[in-house]
C-alpha cells in the first residue's frame, strides 16, 4: 500500500515537472506575466493551451508560425482578403483585445456588417476561454514594441 502511494507520488511529481517544462518551452521568449488579455495577466498555461487551440483551428489559414497567407494585402479573385499574419508583421496588434475577441467570436462580418470574409465565426466552435487563450498565445509572440502599442490602443478605447 505504502509502496503504491510512493509510486503514485513520484509519477505525479514527474508529470507536473514535464508539464511545467513543456509549458515553458512552448510559450516563446516572452514571460507570461508580460502578457495581458482584457487588462488581466495571463498564465503560461493559457499561452500553451492557446498555442494548441491555434494549431488546431487557426493555423490552416493564418499559418503555423502566424505568418498569414501569401500576399495577404491583396484581394483574392473572390474579392475577399487573404488571412493576415498574426505576428508583428501583420495588423492584429493594431486592434484592442475587445475587438480581437469580437472578431474571433462573431467573425469579421459580425463586427463589421456587410463585410465579407472567409474568417469563420468561432463562437459556436470555441468557448470564450479558448478564444482568450488563443489571443493570449498570439500576443505572447509579439515583441515588446507591438505589445506596448497594442496596450496604448486598449487604454485609448477604454481598457479592453
Name each model-derived stretch.
Residues 1-4:
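Positively charged n-region of N-terminal signal peptides that target proteins for export
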Residues 10-24:
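Hydrophobic alpha-helical membrane-insertion segments, chiefly the h-region
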Residues 24-53, 148-153, 157-160:
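Electrostatic cytochrome c docking/interface patches
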Residues 30, 44-45, 51-81, 105-115, ...:
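Periplasmic/extracellular electron-transfer cofactor-ligation site
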Residues 43-46, 96, 127, 143:
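General structural signal for secondary-structure boundaries
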Residues 75-139:
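Extracytoplasmic electron-transfer domains, predominantly the class I c-type cytochrome c fold
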Residues 124-160:
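A charged, solvent-exposed segment within the mature domains of Sec-exported extracytoplasmic proteins
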Amino acid at each position: 500500500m505504502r509502496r503504491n502511494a510512493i509510486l503514485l507520488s513520484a509519477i505525479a511529481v514527474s508529470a507536473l515537472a514535464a508539464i511545467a517544462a513543456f509549458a515553458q518551452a512552448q510559450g516563446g521568449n516572452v514571460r507570461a506575466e508580460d502578457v495581458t488579455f482584457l487588462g488581466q495577466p495571463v498564465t503560461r498555461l493559457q499561452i500553451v493551451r492557446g498555442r494548441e487551440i491555434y494549431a488546431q483551428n487557426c493555423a490552416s489559414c493564418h499559418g503555423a508560425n502566424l505568418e498569414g497567407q501569401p500576399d495577404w494585402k491583396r484581394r483574392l479573385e473572390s474579392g475577399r482578403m487573404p488571412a493576415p499574419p498574426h505576428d508583428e508583421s501583420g495588423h492584429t496588434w493594431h486592434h484592442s483585445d475587445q475587438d480581437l475577441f469580437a472578431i474571433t467570436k462573431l467573425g469579421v462580418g459580425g463586427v463589421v456588417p456587410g463585410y465579407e470574409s472567409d474568417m469563420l465565426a468561432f463562437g459556436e466552435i470555441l468557448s470564450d476561454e479558448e478564444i482568450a487563450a488563443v489571443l493570449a498565445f498570439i500576443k505572447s509572440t509579439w515583441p515588446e514594441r507591438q505589445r506596448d502599442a497594442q496596450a496604448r490602443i486598449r487604454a485609448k478605447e477604454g481598457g479592453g
